[in-house]
Curated annotation (Swiss-Prot):
Express in organ of Corti. This is P2X purinoceptor 2. Gene3D superfamilies: atp-gated p2x4 ion channel, atp-gated p2x4 ion channel domain. The chain crosses the membrane at residues 43-60, 334-354. Glycans are attached at residues 129, 190, 247, 306. One of its GO terms (molecular function) is ATP binding. GO terms for cellular component: apical plasma membrane; plasma membrane; postsynapse; receptor complex. It holds the Pfam family P2X_receptor. It is a multi-pass membrane protein. ATP binds at residues 77, 79, 192, 292, 296, 298, 315. The gene is P2RX2. ATP-gated nonselective transmembrane cation channel permeable to potassium, sodium and calcium. Activation by extracellular ATP induces a variety of cellular responses, such as excitatory postsynaptic responses in sensory neurons, neuromuscular junctions (NMJ) formation, hearing, perception of taste and peristalsis. In the inner ear, regulates sound transduction and auditory neurotransmission, outer hair cell electromotility, inner ear gap junctions, and K(+) recycling. Mediates synaptic transmission between neurons and from neurons to smooth muscle. It catalyses: Ca(2+)(in) = Ca(2+)(out); K(+)(in) = K(+)(out); Na(+)(in) = Na(+)(out). One of its GO terms (biological process) is calcium ion transmembrane transport.
Length: 474
């Protein structure tokens, strides 16, 4: 019976693992003459090359250093007059706020509650839990955050109809009781809006504005046209609403928010004349959501009548304009160019990885390609000192045999029998000599193969030629 080999101790296995950790691996280049595999390899390389050349370098301009979010300054000015049923309105009345910043509102409809004074009056019927039948239904001193004043505890008739509501102490009459509506949008589409915008990219020390370098009379006679006059930033309000895809009359009655987006995408490798603003317009508030669509706000005008403080409450519906500026500037830089070139060259290796996987998974009959692909070379064993060899020569005895890897002849004999050994002899695999060694192994990860060759012969690279016909195809 064959003696059972004891399992290697843990310490020995750890030493073997530590020794294997310091092994060096280097690629081995083999040429596989296979047309379908070559087509796949070149196709993958071509796709990767097109991706980097067209998308990365041409579209994304990855060879440039870039900066996003320019420093921006915006000044706006509105001009025009309009009229309601009984009044003419000018800019000072329908533009809020009047400072001319990046966000402003143009009032297109108002609901006016005039001559409000401090007193007691019926609460609005739209306030929750305000309808009543008796005074007991109203709690004196109660303050509703959604109401218009402090409840007095009385139940009084409403402004119109037969309903009753709780009486409150505050500004009277309340908004529902005496509000009058005025439409200001009749001439509003012809309002003109001047938008002055200047941007600065600090990384590249580049600045530019959206107004052409001309005299002062230029802005008095021009209007914006993206094709013919892009540096005249004077827009008609009707043009802005139309470009946003909205109906002006509907928007003027309910109000809404329109965004004027100015985009500065600049390629600073080109002259500054190629860096031009691009304008786009869209509605920003969700018009299809009834609970949040529209735009309105309230303000009041105070005055005194017969020594009594009086105010006019105005609920204003309007078109709010938000001017939004964004952009990106890019300029050639060596560092991102080198990084992206290195990434491109490295990514081409994906084709080799894919083809290796196809080769070794689907085309590796009889492990022909594995034997050619993987080799493991062991360093020749050297004695720690020459005194055993010298002593043996003096005594006339054979020197001690060196420790070396198993010969390919021996491995071939064990693996495939005498016939494989004869094939190994025909390929030049001889018995190793004890003094000149060149060890290697093919497709045998846990064993090293030693091979002795004369000094004039080069070592063979493939030690297990199991299929000569398959090897001839490589």
């Amino acid at each position: 019976m064959a003696a059972t080999h004891p399992k290697a101790p843990t310490a020995q296995r750890l030493r073997q693992g530590w020794s294997a950790f310091w092994d060096y691996e280097t690629p081995k280049v083999i040429v596989v003459r296979n047309r379908p595999l070559g087509v796949v390899y070149r196709a993958v390389q071509l796709l990767i090359l097109l991706y980097f050349v067209w998308y990365v370098f041409i579209v994304q301009k990855s060879y440039q250093d870039s900066e996003t979010g320019p420093e921006s300054s915006i000044i706006t000015k509105v001009k025009g007059i309009t009229q309601s049923e009984h009044k003419v309105w000018d800019v000072e009345e329908y533009v809020k706020p009047p400072e001319g910043g990046s966000v402003f509102s143009i009032i297109t409809r108002i609901e006016v509650t005039p001559f409000q004074t401090l007193g007691a009056c019926p609460e609005s019927i739209r306030v929750p839990n305000t309808t009543c039948h008796l005074d007991a239904d109203c709690t004196a001193g109660e303050l509703d955050m959604l109401g218009n004043g402090l409840r007095t505890g009385r139940c009084v008739p409403y402004y119109h109809g037969e309903a009753k509501t709780c009486e409150v102490s505050g500004w009277c009459p309340v908004e529902d009781g005496a509000a009058v509506s005025h439409f200001l949008g009749k001439m509003a589409p012809n309002f003109t809006i001047l938008i002055k915008n200047s941007i600065h990219y600090p990384k590249f020390q580049f600045s530019k504005g959206n107004i052409a370098h001309r005299d002062m009379t230029y802005l008095r006679r021009c209007t914006f046209d993206q094709g013919f006059d892009p540096y005249c930033p004077i827009f008609r309000l009707g043009f802005i609403v139309e470009q946003a895809g909205e109906n002006f009359t509907e928007l003027a009655h309910r109000g809404g928010v329109i965004g004027v987006i100015i985009n500065w995408d600049c390629d600073l490798d080109l002259p500054s004349s190629h860096c031009n603003p691009k304008y786009s317009f869209r509605r920003l508030d969700p018009k299809h959501v009834p609970a949040s669509s529209g735009y309105n706000f309230r303000f009041a005008k105070y005055y005194r009548v017969n020594s009594t403080t009086t105010r006019t409450l105005i609920k204003a519906y309007g078109i709010r304009i938000d001017v939004i500026v964004h952009g990106q500037a890019g300029k050639f830089s060596l560092i991102p160019t080198i990084i992206n070139l290195a990434t491109a060259l490295t990514s081409i290796g994906v084709g080799s990885f894919l083809c290796d996987w196809i080769l070794l998974t689907f085309m590796n009959k009889n492990k022909v390609y594995s034997h050619k692909k993987f080799d493991k070379v062991c360093a020749p064993s050297r004695p720690s000192s020459s005194w055993p060899v010298t002593l043996a020569l003096i005594l006339g005895q054979a020197p001690p045999p060196p420790r070396h890897c198993s010969s390919p002849w021996h491995l071939a004999h064990q693996a495939v029998g005498p016939q494989g050994a004869e094939q190994a002899k025909l390929l030049g695999l001889q018995n190793p000599t004890p003094y000149r060694l060149s060890e290697q192994i093919a497709d045998t990860p846990d064993r090293c193969v030693g091979q002795g060759l004369p000094s004039s012969e080069s070592p063979l690279q493939d030690s297990t030629p199991t299929d000569p016909k398959g090897l001839a195809q490589l």
